[in-house]
Amino acid sequence: RLETCGKPVVAALNGTALGGGLEMALACHYRVAVNNPKAKFGLPEVKLGLLPGGGGTQRLPRLIGIQNSLPLMMEGKELSAEKAKGAGIINALASDNDDMMKQAREWCQANPKATAPWDAKGFKYPGGDAKHPAVVQVLAIAPSMLRDKTKGNFPAPENILASVVEGSLVDFDTGLDVEARYFADLVVSQVSKNMINTFWYQLNALNKGDSRPKGFDRSEVKKLGILGAGMMGAGIAYVSAKAGIEVVLKDVSQEAADKGKAYSEGLLDKGMKRGRVTNSQKEELLGRIKATDKVEDLSGCDLIIEAVFEDRDLKASVTKETEAVMDANGVFASN
């Protein structure tokens, strides 16, 4: 109805549009979004064992092409506003809400008889439909690659592929019927029911703390000790310091401990080159990581994580050594 109402319809997006939200936007004639770095755009239904059942498997391929749209739907990728615009999903970016509404009104005034591309006479798929030689080359190997990856246990990507391919060979309205049949096949399957239960209901319950012991206050780690500055220890140190936790990274020698801390520095340097990390942020994070070979520096840690080499005697040794300096209410964990 939006597409064929005879009036220009613009989707003004001031935040995230995933799943049905983006499908509604795709049914509009134009999409303008606020360039909010936290906003995400995509069709992630495959993560729940489903396919985009609101026209997503028909509109997105007709908008950006079969080859470009399949990875977004079959992998459930979520894009930033800038990447969504680069992919052709978003038509324009706005600096704020006022700019977004201004652009939306201007586009409506400039396009009083807007129609969706696929409703225009002579419409052709960007990059070709499923019969185009370039697309055929991809589709010829896609099923076998998909089967190798899913082992036949994950039907959603297969149904997405089938819906897109079959839908490209018929008119748009018939394509919606094709999509509806493949969606119905998934929504009643045990696979999707299990995935929805696990990744929606159970995960939301976990995030709300339903599995936490009752009658205990929430604990907070302010100082974390890590035994072993190898790959695992260095990685734990980085993510912990990034979360604002003071970290003591201990190894058998100062050189080894410094090498573990250097891992965090390397990641931050890469972030600076990409413009995602400032120098002050880098220094602040590195300042939270104390590399040491002295067990005394672990004193006062709320949590100590053992991440040393998989050797029973070594693990026993570092555990015994650490017990002497552990906080009375501290927790000792093994990675």
Task: Annotate the PLM regions.
Residues 207-270, 290:
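NAD(P)+-binding Rossmann beta1-loop-alpha1 motif at the extreme N-terminus of oxidoreductases
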Residues 12-13, 44, 227, 235, ...:
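Structural motif
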Residues 182-195:
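Long amphipathic alpha-helix in the N-terminal Rossmann-like dinucleotide-binding domain
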Residues 23-29, 67-182, 199-201, 205, ...:
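Amphipathic alpha-helical segments at domain termini/boundaries
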Residues 1-14, 56-59, 195-219, 283:
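An acidic, glycine-rich surface segment that forms the CoA-thioester-binding/catalytic face
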Residues 2-48, 52, 228-236:
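Glycine-rich beta-to-alpha active-site loop
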Residues 139, 255-259, 270-334:
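Rossmann-like NAD(P)-binding element
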Residues 57-67:
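Hydrophobic, secondary-structure "cap" segments at the distal end of domains
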